């Protein structure tokens, strides 16, 4: 808990410079979308910047700050839930499932074929095979 307090203070000071710090904490920061907690706290690099990307995917998924600082961050991000309606500030880190992935828990990026090259290739091959077969069948029937 002490860490949280420390982070909060740190975030406040740093964010203040950005000019979004205060607003962020209340509006975007709260969910870590802007970088309020996750922002500095994590290294999320300023989750703000990442969350700011609007694709929270980048920041949220990257989970740099999330996993870096503490899984608890997920909790903060949760605060963003109500702010999810925000274009790119709230949803990113707040929703956590922006790309259908849980940044804090999963830890791996949604679009990272290198994570499971075999699985990815298998799936792709299967799809291709099926498609090809279907196509061939249609052609034959025609």
UniProtKB/Swiss-Prot annotation:
Annotated Basic and acidic residues bias: 107-124
GO CC annotation: extracellular region
Keyword Lipid biosynthesis: no
Region (Disordered): 75-142
Keyword flag Secreted: yes
Signal peptide: 1-16
GO biological process: gastrulation
Main localization category: secreted
Key words, A-Z: Developmental protein, Secreted, Signal
Chain intervals with Basic residues compositional bias: 125-142
Localisation per UniProt entry: Secreted
Known function: Likely to be involved in the establishment of the head.
Protein name: Protein spalt-accessory
């Amino acid at each position: 808990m002490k860490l949280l307090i420390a982070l909060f203070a740190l975030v406040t000071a740093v964010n203040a410079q950005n000019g979004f710090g205060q607003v962020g904490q209340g509006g975007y920061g709260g969910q870590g979308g802007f970088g309020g907690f996750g922002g500095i706290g994590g290294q999320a690099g300023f989750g703000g910047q990442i969350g700011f990307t609007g694709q929270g995917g980048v920041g949220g998924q990257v989970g740099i700050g999330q996993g870096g600082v503490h899984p608890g961050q997920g909790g903060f991000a949760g605060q963003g839930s109500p702010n999810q309606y925000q274009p790119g500030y709230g949803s990113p880190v707040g929703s956590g499932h922006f790309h259908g992935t849980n940044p804090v828990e999963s830890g791996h990026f949604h679009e990272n074929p290198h994570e499971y090259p075999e699985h990815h290739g298998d799936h792709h091959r299967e799809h291709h095979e099926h498609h090809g077969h279907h196509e061939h069948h249609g052609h034959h029937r025609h």
